[in-house]
Amino acid sequence: MAWRLTVPELQDQLQCPICLEVFKEPLMLQCGHSYCKDCLDNLSQHLDSELCCPVCRQSVDCSSSPPNVSLARVIDALRLPGDIEPTVCVHHRNPLSLFCEKDQEFICGLCGLLGSHQHHRVTPVSTVYSRMKEELAGRISELKEEHRNVEEHIGKLVNNRTRIINESDVFSWVIRREFQELHHLVDEEKARCLEGLEGHTRGLVASLDMQLEQAQGTQERLAQAEQVLEQFGNESHHEFIRFHSVASRAEVQQARPLEGVFSPISFKPALHQADIKLTVWKRLFRKVLPAPASLKLDPATAHPLLELSKGNTVVHCGLLAQRRASQPERFDYSTCVLASKGFSWGRHYWEVVVGSKSDWRLGVIKGTASRKGKLNKSPEHGVWLIGLKEGRVYEAFGCPRLPLPVAGHPHRIGVYLHYEQGELTFFDADRPDDLRTLYTFQADFQGKLYPILDTCWHERGSNSLPMVLPPPSGPGHFTLGQV
């Protein structure tokens, strides 16, 4: 027996009289007509009286309407696999050769001229396909560029990680070399410093590993997105256009490009290489340095008002000028005096007792700096000083002067000179086991440097207390020595 109905014509016979769509969960009324379950539910909810069949107008009871199982099976059998839409217009039986840009659906020529799409922007399917193909190619190109950027970022992270580890290895060697000179007295401190360094390095490497893992994850997602999008390019025209926008958006959203730019992590250890020993000295109550001869003051440089005593280790400003030869090395205006020993290399530490003086200055001066007239107290003139003014203001003499936030009133000032490193550091040395930094000058030292003391004017006796270069003391105190 031959079939007289085509599939589209059969679909017309399988439309619900209410929604005019193919039946969904069809129910059969007592009169024999069928309707979608949702259509009957909606219709019965809006009626105050009993329901009548929309086709034959017979009164029916929806609550006793059974499912039309046979009709449902016929509909399921006619439905295409994967629920793929047809390529022929269901209304006009013409090929779906156009695409409505507003409604985002395929239409035929008559739909665009006479149907609901006649005032919409329509484009040939081939044109839409070409346009979307170009968009896909552009997105793939962008993903490839992002992929290259991520690869470059990963390379920088790997190099940064390697550099951190190498610098850590170098610094670890420096620590071991320094601690070998301290022998058994610093074994415990060496273990502590190495542990701190390793922890610092682990933290930096862990941070870089985390960034590396994130970047590699992004790289993998970009590669997957790139592969999925490239596969879309092999689909048929209709399949490609139908799934392009949704699939492309989903894949690209899951593969967001790496945010930010590469920012390298610098290896900055808590200890400066040159200060390892100094830090250990603080912890070991300054017992590790030998005690060479202490500094002495040079009378030939002292201002005429200055009086030296106790083997040229104590100086104070007197009321009357002393009769002294006016020689080039002597200060004739500023109340200053130099130590007899200067330094042109190495690392050195000494202390000065300032007691309760209300005004004082100390530091180092170039041997060639002028000592005649008012002293130019600035690094530009070869003078590096800190001091106390009127018992209240601590300051570093730079350009301009810099007030120093000093806690309390230190009676003993430590001075640490690292000639090659170009560092001059001042400490509050009141407590033997705790050197608190007051200020550090950074400079390119040239020529011999001499410790300098400036007692400042006696102010009619109110500032007449002495400044003292303390002699070598027992194991509880640091003494002058070359590091």
From Swiss-Prot:
Domain B30.2/SPRY as annotated: residue spans: 275-474
Function: E3 ubiquitin-protein ligase that ubiquitinates Beclin-1/BECN1 in a 'Lys-63'-dependent manner enhancing its binding to ULK1. In turn, promotes starvation-induced autophagy activation. Also interacts with p62/SQSTM1 protein and thereby induces the formation and the autophagy clearance of aggresome-associated polyubiquitinated proteins through HDAC6 interaction. Also promotes NLRP3 inflammasome activation by directly inducing NLRP3 oligomerization independent of its E3 ligase function.
GO biological process, one term: regulation of establishment of protein localization
Chain ranges of zinc fingers (RING-type): 16-57
Recorded coiled-coil stretches: 127-169, 203-236
Naturally occurring in which organism (per UniProt): Mus musculus (Mouse)
GO CC terms of this entry: aggresome; cytoplasm
Tissue: Expressed in the stomach.
Name listed for the protein in its UniProt record: E3 ubiquitin-protein ligase TRIM50
Pfam families given in the database record: PRY, SPRY, zf-B_box, zf-RING_UBOX
Gene designation per UniProt: Trim50
Family listed: Belongs to the TRIM/RBCC family.
InterPro entries in UniProt: B30.2/SPRY, B30.2/SPRY_sf, Butyrophylin_SPRY, ConA-like_dom_sf, PRY, SPRY_dom, TRIM/RBCC, Znf-RING_euk
Subunit relationships: Can form dimers and trimers. Interacts with several E2 ubiquitin-conjugating enzymes, including UBE2L6, UBE2E1, UBE2E3. No interaction with UBE2H. Interacts with BECN1. Interacts with SQSTM1. Interacts with NLRP3.
